[in-house]
Amino acid sequence: MAGYTPMIQQYLKIKAEHQDAFLFFRLGDFYEMFFEDAKKASQELEITLTSRDGGAAEKIPMCGVPYHSASAYIEQLIKKGYKVAICEQTEDPKAAKGVVKREVVQLITPGTVMDGKGIHESENNFIASVSACSNGYGLALSDLTTGENLAVLIERLEDVISEIYSVGAREIVVSGSLDADTVAQLRERCGATISIEDGETDEHVTIIEHLNNEDITKTFLRLYTYLKRTQKRSLDHLQPVQVYELEEAMKIDLYSKRNLELTETIRSKNKKGSLLWLLDETKTAMGGRLLKQWIDRPLIRVNQIEERQEMVETLMSHFFEREDLRERLKEVYDLERLAGRVAFGNVNARDLIQLKESLKQVPGIKQLVASLAHDKAKERAKRIDPCGDVLELLEEALYENPPLSVKEGNLIKDGYNQKLDEYRDASRNGKDWIARLEQQEREYTGIRSLKVGFNKVFGYYIEVTKANLHLLEEGRYERKQTLTNAERYITPELKEKEALILEAENNICELEYELFTELREKVKQYIPRLQQLAKQMSELDALQCFATISENRHYTKPEFSKDEVEVIEGRHPVVEKVMDSQEYVPNNCMMGDNRQMLLITGPNMSGKSTYMRQIALISIMAQIGCFVPAKKAVLPIFDQIFTRIGAADDLISGQSTFMVEMLEAKNAIVNATKNSLILFDEIGRGTSTYDGMALAQAIIEYVHDHIGAKTLFSTHYHELTVLEDKLPQLKNVHVRAEEYNGTVVFLHQIKEGAADKSYGIHVAQLAELPGDLIARAQDILKELEHSGNKPEVPVQKPQVKEEPAQLSFFDEAEKPAETPKLSKKEKQVIDAFKSLNILDMTPLEAMNEMYKLQKKLH
């Protein structure tokens, strides 16, 4: 560093302590970056890379962003997984001797973003910490924006990854000694930034006083130490650590959460099209976050589920009160995150006005809930603390429409502070004098166009047009500025009043800022109560959300049994909404004694996967306390749900379709219990026909004989339907479809027994593959059916005399010799089909489009 200027040496010294972050180095009105930071930032932010003299032989790479717009650039970097260290000037440059003192005041990371576009209002922003323990792993979670803290002990790394995926943590704090393979899996499979923390805070941390497990304490302390080191400010809003166990809720593994599209769709990763999208009728950001948490962790205790159901039922039966509640909740801002900003010290006056406006709604909400004709509702109302003292404090202190900045005045009401009132009187009196001065000078000089003005450079002035300069008394005015058509003057008396006014205004701004910080500290004392109130409001919001969606979509209150599944006229909730005005075909599902497994056959795209997902989603909705899309629903409490549905192959990590199938099947087979729900869709499709069939049968037999879980198993292997005669708990069902005028018509009805036809080659005809190719496929199919052997290249002329072993939708006599001539309507449908961008659609959207095309043919 010897050859560099003192400022660059200062930069390098600070940068050495933050090697894993972009260092935003404050220089006047800019944050500057140098050396490799500058090169990389210019690429990531698409800003100009320049250079400057730093004292060495070669110029130093440099780029920068304006201070006032830095947050947008920081958000871009954080979104890409980077960290940003904010280095501020900590002394007045005018008073500095030598290089201005600077230090890092905050390290912003993906897991510690507090506001801005970097976080979604209805999503938590958890940061995770993972530690190796004697019996597995410790996992701690903290959301700086809301103050929530969670911790859990987990045996398997797979479950750790699943939990991190569920909460959407974008940053994971680990020890430098954690196994490298574990760290690599966390980074790659969770898509998170990995941060190392080996220090340990020496302060007394009150939010862990109640913990009695050393592994959990160690894991959370590592996370707390990291937060304290990076944020360099108060963490008073952090709530006591809530310890939970995975077994306290329904476990839904990583694969199943993706396959069932609980919170985002598989292909687009968007909320739209997911169960969360369907259910989200919440009115507050807090309620939206809680709803997602409930979907991620359905309940397994019937009494807890029924408590939610009772409140939902009560709200459904009180339409006007529910609508009033929704309107009031709409006026409640994000109390959790407002409390977090108060604690962090970055709250502004508008935030406190939002807090005030929110608190104004609480008494009405409390009274409304108390009026509901249900004992539990009245008990809930009693627990609501309106925080009236906080409301009174804010109403006394703040103007209704304060500026965004807290250092420009106009924050604090008249009458709140005597000294402030005196300063304001001085300022107002001075301005009144200035206003009178203009009239006096006009009368004295006889210049009607004379005016008194103000600017930040010269202060107050008297402006006279050049045509009237001869009317000014010599020696009375001092020229200050010459304009094209006028001159500006000052007088000793004017400067004297100006000094008094500016001093008063400066005092006002300083005192208002001081009073505002005092107000903020007073509000900080109420944070625990505000957080408790936020919890009450978010629960009410989530429950009214269930009541609203249940009534609007005609859902039914589910009942719970020990072992029986009885779903009458069940509907897939998301598909039903996507279909909108089109008629949805409901289906039954009956499982229980001597009927633990359903083997589902039927044509491709007939609705097998939809039916299976439907049962899983109905079960999840029931266990979060919502009503369900069915005429009647009786369900057991499922402890876990496992799925293998769809073609979400993990090609990026090098895993093929078949490997993904086997991994997901293994996860279910190893971890499922008799109280679990298993959905297997087309197991064995990723390998050869006989291998796939053998594995599918072996999996069915193993689940039947060794696990006994409720299982829905769809297959294209018709040969497996004979298992109904061998396995007492297995029953065949099929999706009904019929042939009409040479076209397959999906009826989407689940019926007892096995399917007897398929239509794979017909789909190829619909896709308008060449006629000779279609004809050749028919020949090959017949040859395979005749030989009963593994697929080989058969002779051209088919000789089929016996009943086909594989499913075929058309009988031999009906096989077209060539592609039939298409009608105008059929051609239009095919053109529409070809124009569909299938890769950009979710499975549900694709199914909906196919249904629309099918309707056009009839």
Curated annotation (Swiss-Prot):
GO biological process: one example: mismatch repair
A Pfam family: MutS_V
SUPFAM superfamilies, per the entry: DNA repair protein MutS, domain I (SSF55271), DNA repair protein MutS, domain II (SSF53150), DNA repair protein MutS, domain III (SSF48334), P-loop containing nucleoside triphosphate hydrolases (SSF52540)
Cellular component annotations (GO), alphabetically ordered: cytosol
InterPro entries: DNA_mismatch_repair_MutS, DNA_mismatch_repair_MutS-lik_N, DNA_mismatch_repair_MutS/MSH, DNA_mismatch_repair_MutS_C, DNA_mismatch_repair_MutS_clamp, DNA_mismatch_repair_MutS_core, DNA_mismatch_repair_MutS_N, DNA_mismatch_repair_MutS_sf
Biological role stated in the UniProt entry: This protein is involved in the repair of mismatches in DNA. It is possible that it carries out the mismatch recognition step. This protein has a weak ATPase activity. Overexpression of mutSL partially suppresses the high spontaneous mutation frequency of a ytkD/mutM/mutY triple disruption which lacks the system required to prevent damage by oxidized guanine (8-oxo-dGTP). This suggests that MutSL also functions to repair mismatches due to oxidative stress in both growing and stationary phase cells.
HAMAP family tied to this protein: MutS
Name listed for the protein in its UniProt record: DNA mismatch repair protein MutS
Source species taxonomy: Bacteria, Bacillati, Bacillota, Bacilli, Bacillales
